Amino acid sequence: VIMNLMDKLTDVFRQGLSNSFYPVPQQAIRVGGTFEGWSPHDAQDIVYHVLVPLSPPPGHTFRLELNTAGMLQRNFCVHVELLCTCAREQLGEDMLCFLHHPKEELRRRQDPSLLHTLCTGDYLDVEKTVHWFYRFIRVAWLLLPDSRHWRLMLQPSCRTCKFQLRKDNESFTVEIVFGVQQRDSDIFVSSQPAEAGIPSTTWLETCAMAEAQF
Protein backbone atom coordinates (compact mmCIF):
# COMPACT_ATOMS: atom_id res chain seq x y z
CA VAL A 1 0.00 0.00 0.00
CA ILE A 2 2.70 2.46 1.02
CA MET A 3 5.01 2.00 -1.96
CA ASN A 4 2.03 2.01 -4.33
CA LEU A 5 0.95 5.32 -2.80
CA MET A 6 4.48 6.73 -3.13
CA ASP A 7 4.56 5.72 -6.81
CA LYS A 8 1.29 7.57 -7.40
CA LEU A 9 2.54 10.68 -5.62
CA THR A 10 5.78 10.60 -7.60
CA ASP A 11 3.84 10.41 -10.88
CA VAL A 12 1.74 13.44 -9.90
CA PHE A 13 4.90 15.32 -8.96
CA ARG A 14 6.57 14.59 -12.28
CA GLN A 15 3.53 15.74 -14.24
CA GLY A 16 3.13 18.88 -12.17
CA LEU A 17 6.81 19.78 -12.36
CA SER A 18 7.35 18.97 -16.03
CA ASN A 19 7.68 22.64 -17.02
CA SER A 20 9.51 23.86 -13.94
CA PHE A 21 13.07 23.71 -12.63
CA TYR A 22 12.59 22.03 -9.29
CA PRO A 23 14.33 18.75 -8.36
CA VAL A 24 12.75 15.72 -10.02
CA PRO A 25 11.59 13.04 -7.52
CA GLN A 26 12.43 9.48 -8.58
CA GLN A 27 10.85 6.19 -7.51
CA ALA A 28 10.82 5.86 -3.73
CA ILE A 29 13.04 3.25 -2.07
CA ARG A 30 11.87 1.43 1.05
CA VAL A 31 14.37 1.48 3.91
CA GLY A 32 14.35 0.06 7.42
CA GLY A 33 12.84 -3.10 8.84
CA THR A 34 9.19 -2.04 9.17
CA PHE A 35 8.40 -3.24 5.63
CA GLU A 36 9.58 -6.75 6.52
CA GLY A 37 7.64 -6.83 9.77
CA TRP A 38 10.67 -6.49 12.04
CA SER A 39 9.22 -3.66 14.14
CA PRO A 40 8.32 -4.71 17.70
CA HIS A 41 5.85 -1.87 18.18
CA ASP A 42 2.10 -1.78 17.87
CA ALA A 43 0.98 -1.26 14.27
CA GLN A 44 -0.42 2.15 15.21
CA ASP A 45 3.07 3.33 16.21
CA ILE A 46 5.00 2.09 13.18
CA VAL A 47 6.79 4.68 11.05
CA TYR A 48 7.57 3.56 7.50
CA HIS A 49 10.75 5.16 6.18
CA VAL A 50 11.29 5.76 2.47
CA LEU A 51 14.09 7.42 0.55
CA VAL A 52 13.09 9.59 -2.42
CA PRO A 53 16.06 10.25 -4.75
CA LEU A 54 16.15 13.69 -6.34
CA SER A 55 17.54 14.31 -9.83
CA PRO A 56 18.53 17.73 -11.15
CA PRO A 57 16.03 19.49 -13.41
CA PRO A 58 16.86 20.31 -17.05
CA GLY A 59 19.71 22.77 -17.40
CA HIS A 60 21.14 21.93 -13.97
CA THR A 61 23.57 19.45 -12.46
CA PHE A 62 24.36 18.36 -8.91
CA ARG A 63 27.97 18.15 -7.73
CA LEU A 64 28.66 16.73 -4.27
CA GLU A 65 31.27 18.50 -2.18
CA LEU A 66 32.64 16.77 0.91
CA ASN A 67 32.37 18.85 4.05
CA THR A 68 35.34 18.18 6.32
CA ALA A 69 33.83 19.87 9.38
CA GLY A 70 34.26 17.85 12.57
CA MET A 71 31.30 15.45 12.41
CA LEU A 72 31.37 11.70 12.99
CA GLN A 73 29.25 10.99 9.89
CA ARG A 74 30.52 11.98 6.46
CA ASN A 75 28.52 14.90 5.14
CA PHE A 76 28.32 16.81 1.90
CA CYS A 77 26.95 19.94 0.30
CA VAL A 78 25.03 19.60 -2.97
CA HIS A 79 26.47 22.23 -5.30
CA VAL A 80 23.92 23.23 -7.95
CA GLU A 81 25.43 24.32 -11.26
CA LEU A 82 23.83 25.54 -14.47
CA LEU A 83 24.44 23.76 -17.77
CA CYS A 84 24.38 25.20 -21.26
CA THR A 85 21.21 24.10 -23.07
CA CYS A 86 21.69 26.06 -26.30
CA ALA A 87 21.95 22.82 -28.30
CA ARG A 88 18.58 21.65 -26.97
CA GLU A 89 17.10 25.01 -27.89
CA GLN A 90 18.39 24.65 -31.44
CA LEU A 91 16.66 21.27 -31.63
CA GLY A 92 13.36 22.98 -30.97
CA GLU A 93 12.94 22.35 -27.25
CA ASP A 94 10.94 25.01 -25.46
CA MET A 95 13.64 26.03 -23.00
CA LEU A 96 15.93 29.03 -22.78
CA CYS A 97 19.55 28.59 -21.74
CA PHE A 98 20.07 30.04 -18.26
CA LEU A 99 23.72 30.75 -19.07
CA HIS A 100 23.40 32.50 -22.42
CA HIS A 101 20.07 34.34 -22.47
CA PRO A 102 19.61 37.84 -21.03
CA LYS A 103 18.29 37.82 -17.46
CA GLU A 104 15.36 40.04 -18.38
CA GLU A 105 14.25 37.63 -21.10
CA LEU A 106 14.58 34.69 -18.70
CA ARG A 107 12.44 36.46 -16.08
CA ARG A 108 9.79 37.22 -18.66
CA ARG A 109 9.59 33.90 -20.48
CA GLN A 110 10.75 31.16 -18.13
CA ASP A 111 10.37 29.92 -14.56
CA PRO A 112 13.32 30.71 -12.27
CA SER A 113 16.22 28.30 -12.00
CA LEU A 114 16.67 26.02 -9.01
CA LEU A 115 19.37 28.39 -7.75
CA HIS A 116 16.66 31.01 -7.13
CA THR A 117 14.12 28.74 -5.44
CA LEU A 118 15.47 25.98 -3.19
CA CYS A 119 19.11 26.97 -2.80
CA THR A 120 21.06 28.97 -0.26
CA GLY A 121 23.85 30.48 -2.27
CA ASP A 122 24.82 27.81 -4.79
CA TYR A 123 23.84 24.89 -2.56
CA LEU A 124 20.63 22.87 -2.38
CA ASP A 125 18.97 23.67 0.94
CA VAL A 126 17.48 20.73 2.88
CA GLU A 127 14.90 22.79 4.77
CA LYS A 128 13.74 24.71 1.69
CA THR A 129 13.43 21.41 -0.21
CA VAL A 130 11.35 19.82 2.56
CA HIS A 131 9.11 22.89 2.84
CA TRP A 132 8.57 22.85 -0.94
CA PHE A 133 7.64 19.15 -0.86
CA TYR A 134 5.16 19.73 1.98
CA ARG A 135 3.42 22.46 -0.05
CA PHE A 136 3.22 20.32 -3.15
CA ILE A 137 2.04 17.17 -1.37
CA ARG A 138 -1.05 19.02 -0.09
CA VAL A 139 -2.10 19.62 -3.69
CA ALA A 140 -0.91 16.28 -5.10
CA TRP A 141 -2.84 14.33 -2.47
CA LEU A 142 -6.17 15.80 -3.57
CA LEU A 143 -5.55 14.50 -7.09
CA LEU A 144 -5.28 10.88 -5.94
CA PRO A 145 -8.33 8.56 -5.65
CA ASP A 146 -6.92 7.46 -2.26
CA SER A 147 -7.79 10.89 -0.83
CA ARG A 148 -11.47 9.87 -0.85
CA HIS A 149 -10.79 7.07 1.64
CA TRP A 150 -7.75 8.17 3.63
CA ARG A 151 -7.25 11.34 5.63
CA LEU A 152 -3.84 12.97 5.23
CA MET A 153 -2.29 14.72 8.24
CA LEU A 154 1.07 16.40 7.72
CA GLN A 155 3.47 16.39 10.66
CA PRO A 156 5.93 19.31 10.60
CA SER A 157 9.62 18.45 10.32
CA CYS A 158 12.67 20.40 9.18
CA ARG A 159 14.71 17.73 7.40
CA THR A 160 12.13 15.08 6.43
CA CYS A 161 8.56 15.03 5.13
CA LYS A 162 6.40 13.18 7.63
CA PHE A 163 2.69 12.46 7.35
CA GLN A 164 0.04 10.19 8.80
CA LEU A 165 -2.79 8.49 6.92
CA ARG A 166 -6.00 7.48 8.70
CA LYS A 167 -9.03 5.45 7.60
CA ASP A 168 -11.59 4.16 10.10
CA ASN A 169 -9.47 2.33 12.71
CA GLU A 170 -6.39 2.09 10.50
CA SER A 171 -3.49 4.50 10.54
CA PHE A 172 0.18 4.56 9.63
CA THR A 173 2.93 7.14 9.42
CA VAL A 174 5.35 7.66 6.55
CA GLU A 175 8.62 9.57 6.84
CA ILE A 176 10.25 10.63 3.57
CA VAL A 177 13.98 11.30 3.46
CA PHE A 178 15.33 12.96 0.32
CA GLY A 179 18.59 11.88 -1.26
CA VAL A 180 21.06 12.70 -4.00
CA GLN A 181 22.94 9.77 -5.49
CA GLN A 182 26.74 9.63 -5.45
CA ARG A 183 27.47 9.00 -9.12
CA ASP A 184 26.26 5.48 -10.06
CA SER A 185 26.70 3.94 -6.61
CA ASP A 186 24.14 2.78 -4.04
CA ILE A 187 25.37 5.53 -1.71
CA PHE A 188 23.31 8.68 -1.24
CA VAL A 189 23.65 11.92 0.63
CA SER A 190 20.36 12.50 2.40
CA SER A 191 18.22 14.92 4.37
CA GLN A 192 18.00 12.52 7.33
CA PRO A 193 17.72 14.19 10.77
CA ALA A 194 21.01 15.43 12.15
CA GLU A 195 22.47 16.95 15.28
CA ALA A 196 21.25 20.37 16.37
CA GLY A 197 22.91 23.34 14.74
CA ILE A 198 23.85 21.60 11.50
CA PRO A 199 23.60 23.97 8.48
CA SER A 200 20.57 23.47 6.26
CA THR A 201 22.86 22.98 3.26
CA THR A 202 24.43 19.87 4.83
CA TRP A 203 23.41 16.44 3.52
CA LEU A 204 24.50 13.30 5.40
CA GLU A 205 25.92 10.22 3.72
CA THR A 206 23.72 7.13 3.96
CA CYS A 207 24.06 3.52 2.83
CA ALA A 208 20.36 2.79 3.37
CA MET A 209 19.74 1.73 -0.23
CA ALA A 210 22.76 -0.60 -0.29
CA GLU A 211 21.67 -2.12 3.03
CA ALA A 212 18.10 -2.56 1.76
CA GLN A 213 19.37 -4.92 -0.95
CA PHE A 214 20.58 -7.46 1.61
Task: Describe the residue ranges of each PLM region.
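Non-catalytic helical "accessory" subdomain of NTase-fold nucleotidyltransferases
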Residues: 1-214
